[in-house]
Amino acid sequence: MQEFYDPKNIESTIQQYWHENNTFTVTEDFSKEKYYCLSMLPYPSGNLHMGHVRNYTIGDVLSRYHRMLGKNVMQPIGWDAFGLPAERAALKNQTAPATWTYANIETMKKQLKQLGFSYDWSREITTCRPEYYRWEQWFFIQLYEKGLVYKKTSFVNWCSNDQTVLANEQVIDGCCWRCGAPIMLKDIPQWFLKITAYADQLLHDLDKLDGWPEQIKNMQRNWIGRSEGINITFQVIDMKETLTIYTTRPDTLMGVTYLSIAINHHLAQQAANNNRLLSDFIEHSRPTKLSEAEIVKVNRVKTGIFTGLYAIHPLTEEKLPIWVTNFVLMDYGTGAIMAVPGHDQRDWDFARQYNLPVKNIIRNIDGSKPTISGIIPEGILYNSGEFNGLRSLEASKIITDILVARGIGETKVNYRLRDWVISRQRYWGTPIPMMTLEDGTVVPTPVDQLPVILPEYLLINSISNPLKDDHLWMKTNYNNNIATRETDTFDTFMESSWYYARYTCPNYDQGMLDTTAANYWLPIDQYIGGIEHAIMHLMYFRFYHKLLRDAGMLTSDEPTIRILCQGMVLADSFYYISCTTGERIWVSPINVRVQRDEKGNIINAIDLQGHHLVYAGTIKMSKSKNNSIDPLTMVEKYGADTIRLFIMFASPVTMALEWRESGVEGANRFLKRLWKLTYDHIQRGKVIKLDLAAMSNDNKILRRELHQTIAKVTDDISRRYAFNTAIAALMEITNKLMHASYHSQQDRAIVQEALLAVVRMLYPFTPHLCFKLWQALNGEGDIDNAPWPIVDQLALVEDTNLIVIQINGRFRSKIIVPVSADKALIIERASKEKLVAKYLEGTKVQKIIYVPGKLLNLVLK
């Protein structure tokens, strides 16, 4: 063993050993408990960032830990390789998206290996490969034949910047989730997957997911948006037409003063035939320049026009005017609402603007009048005829029963969740395996012609889809008839919705999944990724799992037992204002010299060119703020183990982590100390076997502290996921070992036991260093196959107490006494201690303060 820690040499050698020996390659072993650990599929953007490193380090720590428990551990990796960024990069660099993507994969694969992650590389998946998406196309056809896929012309979210459709889940505050551009609605033909058919299952099965964060489950519950209400039929006067309205609050029916319908409601279209003003309003208000989120905003200017039609109130038989408005969505409920301006802000705003009547009908429980900002959940009805004095819930039930009995009401369950728009007007994606015949008939591609292979090396010359210009690819044959291929491609969330299952059998060519392998490994035991995926990926992959189950391929209901959402990685950020453009120029923290005050706060910052900088605080690492730290630069400087240790130590894994190179240096110093401690221990020569019966009191104390550490670290990793406190405990016991006695063979034997345990417990965090230390300590076999240390319960039993001795409240000495020692014996023993006895000479003890088992304080006169 060399004297000084040299991570560069150590890490590359051990990584090569793992590669040559296929150390982390696994197969199904039904004699072992399995453990499937998975980090979310990365997009091959070109280089790893610290967010990647944090995510994958967490997964690797858990994988290595469970492998040491004797489990059959699978930790695979792959690439979410389709997507718009590749098209943008290809357009910018005048290359094919495939060229850019495959080059990035090779770069990132090399970087992952440099960090020492224990992946089973034999299971690597690349989603843009035909051998992967072939089965996605096949499954799509199965779903189409089951009626779970359909195509329709619909208003959909359209990103004008990326020239493609977005699912509702991909629109955030009216903007594209990827590029941030404002979203508009566009009426175009799209392919949909019937996720609404599984809405109840997706909702109810959340209650089974005890290992999921409550925040994610609540986000999904809210997105699914199940509501129980009633469809009420309003008769339109002088027409055979009726208007059906869905409401969850039938108790407010007596407060309705007008009805609102969406501009694309069939009744609006019908009324517009003989009403030029209405026709012009509908044409002007079509939601082509607004997203759905913008349409329903409470503070948006509300406009409308009277249709000239009236409906009859189902209980009072009053005439209710029907208005076409710009804030009612056709795709939610029935596209019509009953307006209760006395108890709804939006309805009140509209009523005030158009001088429509307002009727208050519900008071607070205490009798006070509520605000108009929203309907109160429970109140008392008044101004409501026969329902006066009833509470809201009771009134809702009675009114519902009356309407149902009269045949003008039907109880109904509605969902906020919409069917998933899975088609995209992009090139770099999985081709949708459908074709259109000359007579307009749309048919699936015959299964024996799958996969429909995407021509990989088309150049992108504009924002348009080059598939539409590739006539050789577009034209095909179907049963000797000319057919045209679908040029839309799948939403890339399709690929990432089932990759986890394909990892169980990546090379299986007889079907989508090998059911034996898939049902051995699934569900995932631990899934790791960001909470930003809560209502996109995490919803879709739950849905896909149920589809695979219902297709007979899986037996479990949910894809993963546990989810861990890691926090963001933050870093200092600095900028100056350009003298020429007035823009903010962001400067990398590694090129900044800072001055701090006595509390460590930054009070001045200058870059290498002499610009005086504005400190913008610690914010999420990003390219736009130029505050990303290259992981591989840090690995080159400190070694992978140091970076891994810092990442896991600097913060609880679910909290934000502030990048501090001073903290990295601290982690590196600790590893150097442990290396030197082990080196010095080995240099002292051969170690005898520890004789438990011959241990000194100091030996017993050190061994007890060791096994307390084993118990704590085990609990911190396995149950609490408190990796930072586990590392802190390992640092503490290491510090005690550095000050341990080496006077006897027994002393050295206890240090040997402790070092072997510490190295094994640190191994999941710093596997390269621990691999070498284990060898140097003559550990049995490779540490990759070593068992996790077991707590010796007898070592935890305390047969002695350490008593602190104080004189007049100041520390003077400490003594070790049997647990059974009483106060008198402790006073006697303390009085004989040299450091205590000299203070007692010629004085009298006025008072004795004794804390049993801990402290003796002698107060002198």
From Swiss-Prot:
Gene Ontology cellular-component terms listed: cytosol
Extent of motif 'HIGH' region: 42-52
Localisation: Cytoplasm
Pfam assignment, any one: tRNA-synt_1_2
Any one biological process term the GO annotation gives: leucyl-tRNA aminoacylation
Residues the record lists as binding ATP: K623
Keyword rRNA-binding: no
GO molecular function: aminoacyl-tRNA deacylase activity; ATP binding; leucine-tRNA ligase activity
Span(s) of short sequence motif 'KMSKS' region: 620-624
Uppermost EC category: ligase
Source superkingdom: Bacteria
Its EC number(s): 6.1.1.4
Chief location of this protein within or outside the cell: cytoplasm
Catalyzed reaction equations: tRNA(Leu) + L-leucine + ATP = L-leucyl-tRNA(Leu) + AMP + diphosphate
Keywords from the named record: Aminoacyl-tRNA synthetase, ATP-binding, Cytoplasm, Ligase, Nucleotide-binding, Protein biosynthesis
SUPFAM superfamilies attached to this UniProt entry: Anticodon-binding domain of a subclass of class I aminoacyl-tRNA synthetases, Nucleotidylyl transferase, ValRS/IleRS/LeuRS editing domain
Family: Belongs to the class-I aminoacyl-tRNA synthetase family.
HAMAP family: Leu_tRNA_synth_B (MF_00049_B)
Protein name: Leucine--tRNA ligase
Organism: Baumannia cicadellinicola subsp. Homalodisca coagulata
Highest classification ranks of the organism: Bacteria, Pseudomonadati, Pseudomonadota, Gammaproteobacteria, Candidatus Palibaumannia
